[in-house]
Structure formats: structure tokens, C-alpha cells
Amino acid sequence: PIPFELQHTPFLKYAEHAKKSGLNMKIACVGGFHYFDDVDQAVAEGKVDIVSAARAFISNPDYGQLLQEGRDEDLVPCLRCNKCHGRGKHDIMTTVCSVNPKFGFEAVDRYLAYPVDKVKDIAVIGGGPGGMRTAIYLADRGHKVTIYEAEGELGGAIRHSDYIPFKWTLKDYKDLSLI
């Protein structure tokens, strides 16, 4: 097997090589283009003509609008866990997103954040990623939400993802989503 280091844009160097080779065609690159700076830089530096993205739109259904408006602070970072690409030979048609629980369920009413008729004060016990996403969902519906976390700091176990360099996607998720 070929070792693969998880980078923001692991295939950009190959696209850049193709671009420099003098091919008379537009060169596109896919893989890891989630952050606006990476997209802008790759095109501005002439490394590619087109940037392709899929997971950025899965974790952020409004990615195009966020990009156009320059609202990178509103991005939900993709963990690149590949759960959106199917779950193996026994369940190839089931696809989910670790950071966008609505993905794949958009047409099912109970998963959508419709405004509530009666606002409630709701306590969410636990301030890990699941508790925080639940709080966001409930707040989006119009409820008043309070998160109770025993540790005094939000994030749960993901707070400890800083110390392993190859877990940078979790660190990005923590740093950008848990603020």
C-alpha cells in the first residue's frame, strides 16, 4: 500500500504538475478543498483552473453561498471520515455525515428544523459534539436552550484532539465549531 498523509489538498501537487506540463485543457482538482483560502489560493496561484468539491457541500449544504459571501467562520469543518461515501459492502446505499446529521434525511420532516409553535426552556445534559449539535438544532427550532456540562468546558472528548498531529481534522472541527 502507498502511505497517505491526510492533508488539506493532497492531490493539488499532481494537478499543478499537469497544469505546468503544457496540456491544452482546463485542469481541475478534487480532494480536501474545504476552506475558502485553499480554493482561492489554488486558483489565484494558477495551480488549477477549477476546484471540485463534494464533502464541503455535504457538511455544509450552503457551502456555495457561504463561499460567495466570504463567511468561512460559519463553516462546519468536514472530518473527512468518509461516512458520506457509503458504509461498506453490506450497506452501500446508506450514507451519513458525522457533522451534518440532516444529510440524507432532508425530505423527512422530523429531521428538519421547523419553527415550533410553543417555545420551551430545554436543558441539554452534556456539552460534547452531540450535545452541542442537539442544542443548535433545538435553538434553530426556536427553543431556549441551556447546555449543562460537568467539566466546565464544552467539547467532550474532542477537546483532547490537539496533541496528535494526524488528527488535525478533529482539531479544526473543535476549534471552528466549538467556539
Predicted regions and their residues:
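Gly-rich Lys/Arg/Thr-decorated short loops/hinges at beta-loop-alpha junctions or inter-strand turns
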Residues: 1, 156-163
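N-terminal glycine-rich dinucleotide-binding loop that anchors FAD/FMN and/or NAD(P) in oxidoreductases
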Residues: 74-75, 79-80, 160-179
